[in-house]
Regions:
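Conserved PLP-anchoring active-site segment centered on the Schiff-base-forming lysine
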Residues: 136-155, 177, 181
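N-terminal "arm"/small-domain region of PLP-dependent enzymes with the aminotransferase-like
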Residues: 3-92
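Active-site phosphate-binding strand-loop segment of PLP-dependent enzymes
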Residues: 170, 174-237
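Substrate-binding/gating loop at the entrance of the active-site cleft, primarily
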Residues: 128, 148-165
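Conserved Walker B
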Residues: 97, 152, 208, 240-242
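Active-site PLP attachment segment
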Residues: 256-281
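Conserved N-terminal alpha-helix of the aminotransferase class I/II PLP-enzyme fold
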Residues: 78-128
Length: 281
């Protein structure tokens, strides 16, 4: 191990140790507002869970989401500047929300091109994958619908589910097709409106599960859902955050790679990972 790497490790340990110092008792003469904040942070410090922010360094980063390295090559920057020069009327700011005057001609054109690339009816770009997942799972399932989801769905999806009108929410064991079938059969028997095809079962899964490194058995899940709910009211939402840009025709993701794009109602993808950009759709 090089001296530089050793020194960097020692520096990180020193920064971490410094961040664990208890501050609440020294705040007795401060405003209760700031004292309460420090006392709350002290709970994390006592457990060694207060982590300082590190600047990028020369060490190898095995946790990066820049999986294709495009953010580090300089090629993306060059293409961005070329695109900027080719569109002198490009408006740099938002100027307002999308519902007011925040939608530009360039953005509208981009979303149409993206929809064409993905072979879907329409695409909507928001500022992050977190926002995209939260928006989808909080607004698409309606009252009386049932949410069935893989137990390892990302926290962003779970955040949206918490404020969804679909109050009946049931997880199934991770990538377990047999347990998925059990859950879906239970939904069918306990929810007459869903059984009759008058309400929907919204199934949430990820294509690639980044924390576990495995792949969703999407085809098997879809086939099972169609058999259990022949009215076509079992619909899938697939989080493609870690597959968009790395598989499928022209990098369009796992769903299209499997030829299942006509079987999936909504796919969510991010530009922050393989594409080294920002935003989610």
């Amino acid at each position: 191990m090089s001296d530089a790497t050793t020194d960097l490790g020692a520096q990180w340990r020193e920064e971490w140790a410094g961040a664990q110092k208890i501050k609440g008792p020294s705040m007795k003469n401060s405003s209760v507002f700031y004292r309460n904040i420090e006392e709350e942070l002290d709970m994390s410090r006592k457990s060694g869970l207060c982590f300082p922010i590190h600047l990028p360094s020369h060490v190898s980063d095995f946790s990066t989401c820049d999986v294709l390295g495009m953010g580090h090559t300089g090629a993306l920057r060059e293409e961005f500047l070329k695109e900027l020069d080719a569109n002198p009327g490009f408006y740099m700011g938002a100027g307002g929300s999308r519902l007011l005057d925040g939608t530009t001609e360039y953005q509208d054109s981009f979303e149409k091109e993206l929809a064409k690339l993905m072979g879907v009816e329409s695409a909507l770009v928001v500022h992050s994958g977190y926002t995209a997942n939260q928006a989808i799972f909080s607004t698409v399932p309606r009252s009386g619908d049932v949410l069935v989801y893989d137990e390892l769905m990302h926290a962003t999806a779970l955040s949206g589910m918490k404020i969804s009108l679909a109050l009946d929410q049931r997880p199934f064991r991770h990538n377990d097709v047999e347990h998925f079938i059990e859950v879906m059969e239970a939904v069918k028997e306990s929810t007459p409106l869903v059984k009759a095809g008058k309400r929907c079962v919204i199934v949430g899964v990820e294509s690639y599960y980044s924390m576990d490194g495995d792949i969703c058995p999407l085809r098997e899940l879809i086939e099972a859902a169609k058999e259990i709910f022949p009215h076509g009211n079992a619909q899938f939402i697939v989080d493609e955050a870690h597959s968009f840009g790395v598989c499928g025709p022209e990098g369009t993701g796992f769903v299209r790679e499997q030829g299942l794009n006509d079987e999936v109602a909504i796919t969510m993808a991010t530009f922050t990972k393989a594409l080294s950009g920002a935003g989610g759709e």
